[in-house]
Regions:
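Residues immediately within or flanking Cys/His clusters that coordinate Zn2+
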Residues: 184, 398, 467-469, 512, ...
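Residue patterns forming the tRNA-binding/recognition surfaces of aminoacyl-tRNA synthetases
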Residues: 2-20, 26, 30-34, 106-243, ...
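Short cysteine-rich clusters marking metal-coordination/redox-active sites
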Residues: 187, 401, 472, 515-518, ...
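Alpha-helical recognition segments enriched in aromatics with Gly/Pro capping
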Residues: 345-357, 461-463, 485-636
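Acidic, turn-prone loop/beta-hairpin segments
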Residues: 95, 184, 188, 194-202, ...
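Protease-associated
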Residues: 247, 254-327, 336-340
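Cys/His-coordinated zinc-binding microdomains
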Residues: 191, 460, 476, 519, ...
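N-terminal catalytic cores of NTP/NDP-binding nucleotidyl/phosphoryl-transfer enzymes
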Residues: 42-103, 164, 234-242, 314-341, ...
Length: 922
């Protein structure tokens, strides 16, 4: 008889090979037909709310790994909350306005944008943004992200723009917005102001110079010195700013020395820096003639080194003694401190550089030169004029535009500002009510808000939300009132913000409108600047979330580390400054950057980038999700082909674990689970280990430690199941009677394990866990349509073994490990072949004496040998010998009892009984 047919062989039909790139699109179609997102909301309607507000990615390109990491984490969070009984609406969004899109369409389409009408140019930008929204949306959907993809929010949508206009109006009304001439970050390449969040620092080589400013008017205080030889020495790393110099700042309380050099020249510098500066100047010896506090020199005049003008000596507490000369070059058109200092002294603002970064006529012979072009020319002129004290080549950290990557300048221009100082304390206080993950996020954002200057919110761009301000042609004053804001918002709601560029000011204002300042109605002009894109995204919690979903604040914001100075901060400032509320989020979570396998940033120039679309096609989206779910995202997350190959192995461990369970649950009815009292202790051990896993996973989801979830499940599959439990129960599953109590006991444990693991891993391995769920048997209370419609299970406490029993099983596992080692050696020595050919003699120490009392057949099954004898001795030892008896033709155990049942000469009694009970097939 062929006994293989009498075995309960695995037969679920669940494939071992995942084939994710082919199978996942089929699952996406299933979810679409199921209307997964809306069905999930219906399922959890009325339950506690968890609202994750989507930080909007910029719609200017295809997905990259940073997008993928961010959206994967968001999906893990939403799914895990949904499966713990929360109502989880999730509206994805996109940030649409700004310079990156302008630059991209000009470059790609070779547009002469300056020859186009503003409305036509903006229409082209709108179409570009819409295209990449579609591209990114399809990528996110391919990842399996559950969201309301048909109704996203867009910062360029008319409804959003109208709400943002009202945000601006309220902030203006609160007195937090003003227009002024102040130095701001300026990109000459893109000809626009930048916010702090739009700059990044790079190390650049530069020439740093020490420059002599000859004494012009000493106010009679230094008449005893030869004024023709007397100079102040300043230091700067930006040579091009020297034409804009109006003053030299000294610290009022620091000591300044008049230093005589061997060449007879007299130099004024901070006494504390004299040795260092004179050394840089090449002087081995010098004499300090006299010293005075910085305040002594106030209001003296020095001559500019190469322009026909003077520089005033002023005092400033910010002057430090850690670098330079203690005499600080002060150009109010190029620095915030410089500006404030000169303002305090009543000096006029001078900005000798235009929008394109070229010197104006004020700079004399350097007019028309770009700042970087003028550096070597000015340097050479100073050398020839004898005004250069010294120069050095250094590398310093310099700000660059985050979009065009070119160096920027600090330049005073008329701009609109948000006065953060007036509500800074409230914004800082609001941080106290937020849960920060990681916890240091609170201090990071608090310190950034504390140290920040006023927020420059205007941009000299065309693709953006127009600043909703009119100007009176009579008095020239800006106009922003409740009446004008309502009028603009209503027009934008119907026509979009292009109306600003298509309609006359008078047509946008209410009939009979008069200037609130002068009462005239002769005419009005519109502001030409647009709002900073960070004002757009900072308004999303009001303009999109509260409008579309009706709740505020969000439960959570989650974005990359750079958003402390970006979206987190702008959202907080808008919420506090405009709405008078607290933080727009209850929890704030951050993740690191995506880098290559060596920890380097991914760039096209390095050729080290990875494309999510290629990963979908090669490995499948679940592997990308597993990458995100296995990584400690609090630090930079590495990705490479080698990493994905390793993840493929981890994935297969889980898939094969699920397949083993499914294969052996064929015909099993979960409504007839074996009661704990009737289960074999080994099976209860497995469920008790599962309970520990459930608790770890719940704690990890609560802490948003998804890598801990993945690692815990992987370890459980590999250590507890594959290497221990599954090996032991195979004989019972395959060889015991199909409906026997022993087999049903194991199947009960397998069902509980598979059911719990599938639910727990579903937030991360969305496609695979859904595939398992659709293939496995279910209880009547479960929703078989999708694993996502079911809650994660709580520990099965009724099945749990007591602690002393678990301690015994830990000792059994240790003995089994020792037996396995001895079996391996016996195989190597050709003493045995397979482990079932072995008989083992085990000596155990006194603390393991319970093993000697165990049923020998049960212990042999645990050790996967045919025969075992246990004696108590001093230490653990194992001896292996060939088993005595005959090999059973069905289960392959070697037993002396084989053939003792009449009519079954080749079977052991267990197998003979099972075969006898089988129905006779004619």
């Amino acid at each position: 008889m062929e006994y293989k047919k009498t075995l309960n062989m695995p037969k679920s039909g669940f494939p071992m090979r995942a084939g994710l790139p082919k199978r996942e699109p089929e699952m996406l179609r299933y979810w679409q037909e199921l209307d997964l997102y809306n069905e999930l909301l219906k399922k959890n309607e009325g339950k506690p709310l968890f609202s994750l507000h989507d930080g909007p990615p910029f719609s200017n390109g295809a997905l990259h790994m940073g997008h993928a990491l961010n959206k994967a984490l968001k999906d893990f969070i939403n799914r895990s909350y949904a499966m713990r009984g929360y109502y989880t609406p999730y509206i994805p969004g996109w940030d649409n306005h700004g310079m990156p899109i302008e630059s991209a369409i000009i470059k790609q389409n070779k547009l002469n944008h300056k020859a186009m009408s503003v409305a036509d140019f903006r229409t082209a930008c709108h179409q570009f943004a819409d295209h990449y929204i579609d591209v990114q949306r399809e990528g996110f959907k391919r990842m399996g992200v559950v969201a309301d993809w048909e109704h996203p929010y867009k910062t360029m949508d008319p409804g959003f723009e109208a709400r943002e206009v009202r945000v601006f109006g309220q902030m203006y009304k609160n007195g937090h917005i003003y227009k002024g001439l102040k130095p701001v970050y300026w990109c000459p390449h893109d000809e626009t102001a930048l916010a702090e969040a739009e700059i990044e620092y790079q190390d650049d080589p530069c020439t740093t110079v020490y420059v002599k400013f000859p004494m012009n008017d000493d106010l009679g205080k230094l008449s005893h010195l030869d004024k023709s030889k007397l100079s102040f020495v300043i230091w700067t790393t930006t040579i091009w700013t020297l034409p804009g110099n109006l003053a030299i700042a000294l610290h009022p309380d620091e000591s300044y020395a008049v230093v005589k050099a061997p060449n007879g020249e007299l130099y004024i510098m901070a006494e504390a820096l004299t040795e260092k500066v004179m050394g840089i100047g090449g002087f081995d010896s010098y004499e300090i003639v006299e010293t005075h506090p910085g305040s002594f020199y106030e209001n003296m005049l020095a001559s500019h080194p190469f322009l026909p003008k003077t520089s005033r000596l002023v005092l400033a507490d910010y002057v430090t003694m850690d670098s330079g000369t203690g005499c600080v070059h002060t150009a109010p058109g190029f620095g915030a401190d410089d500006y404030q200092t000169c303002l305090r002294y009543g000096m006029d603002m001078v900005v000798p550089v235009d929008d394109q970064g070229r010197h104006t006529d004020y700079a004399g012979k350097y007019a028309g030169m770009k700042t970087e072009e003028s550096n070597p020319v000015i340097l050479q002129d100073m050398k020839e004029a004898g005004s250069l004290f010294a120069s050095q080549e250094i590398v310093h950290s310099y700000p660059h535009c985050w979009r065009c990557k070119k160096p920027i300048i600090f330049r005073a221009t008329p701009q609109w500002f948000c006065s953060v100082e007036s509500f800074k304390d409230d914004a800082i206080a609001a941080c106290e009510d937020v849960r920060w993950v990681p916890s240091w996020g609170k201090d990071r954002l608090r310190s950034m808000v504390l140290e920040r200057t006023d927020w420059c919110i205007s941009r000299q761009r065309r693709w953006g939300l127009p600043i909703p301000v009119f100007y009176c042609k009579d008095c020239g004053k800006p106009i922003c009132t409740d009446e004008t804001i309502d009028a603009i918002a209503n027009i934008f709601e119907k026509k979009g913000s292009n109306a600003w560029f298509e309609m006359e000011a008078e047509d946008m204002l209410p009939e009979g409108f008069t200037c609130p300042h002068c009462g005239k109605s002769a005419g009005f002009e519109k502001e030409t600047d647009t709002l900073d894109g960070w004002f757009d995204s900072g308004s999303t919690h009001y303009a999109a979330m509260e409008r579309d979903q009706g709740f505020w604040p969000a439960t959570m914001y989650i974005e990359g580390l750079d958003q402390y100075r970006g979206w987190f901060q702008s959202s907080l400032l808008v919420a506090v400054g405009a709405l008078g509320r607290g933080a727009p989020f209850k929890e704030c979570l951050t993740h690191g950057w995506t880098v290559d396998g060596q920890g380097r940033a991914m760039h096209k120039s390095l050729g080290n980038g990875m494309d999510p679309a290629e990963i979908f096609n090669k490995y499948g989206a679940d592997l990308l999700r597993l990458w995100a779910g296995s990584s400690d995202y609090h630090v930079d997350v590495r990705c490479s082909d080698d990493i994905f190959k390793q993840l493929s192995q981890n994935y297969l461990k889980f898939r094969n674990t699920a397949k083993f369970c499914l294969d052996n649950l064929t015909g099993f009815d979960p409504e007839q689970l074996v009661a704990a009292a009737d289960m074999q202790e080994l099976d209860r051990w497995a469920v008790t280990r599962l309970n520990s896993l459930i608790r770890r996973v719940f704690d990890s989801y609560d802490a948003y430690e998804f890598h801990a979830v993945s690692h815990a499940i992987n370890d459980f599959c590999e250590v507890d199941l594959s290497s221990f439990y599954f090996d032991i129960i195979k004989d019972r599953l395959y060889c015991d009677g199909e409906h026997s109590a022993s087999r049903r006991s194991a199947q009960t444990a397998l069902f509980l394990i598979l059911d719990a693991m599938t639910r727990m891993f579903a937030p991360i391995l969305a496609f695979t866990c859904e595939e398992i769920w659709l293939a496995m048997p279910h209880r009547q209370a479960d929703d078989g349509r999708s694993v996502l419609f079911n809650c994660m299970v709580q520990p099965y406490e009724d099945y749990a073994l007591p602690e002393d029993a678990m301690d015994r099983w830990a000792r059994i596992a240790a003995v089994r490990s020792a037996v396995n080692g001895a079996l391996e050696q016996a195989r190597a020595d050709k003493t045995i072949g397979k482990s079932l050919e072995a008989e083992v003699d085990v000596t155990v120490p006194a603390e393991d004496a319970f093993l000697a009392d165990m049923d020998a057949d049960t212990l042999a099954d645990l050790l996967i040998v045919s025969q075992v004898r246990v004696t108590v001795g001093d230490a653990l030892s194992v001896t292996v010998a060939p088993a005595q008896g005959v090999k059973c033709a069905r289960c392959w155990k070697v037993l002396t009892s084989v053939g003792t049942v009449a009519g079954h000469d080749t079977l052991c009694p267990r197998c003979a009984a099972v075969v006898k009970a089988l129905p006779v097939v004619e």
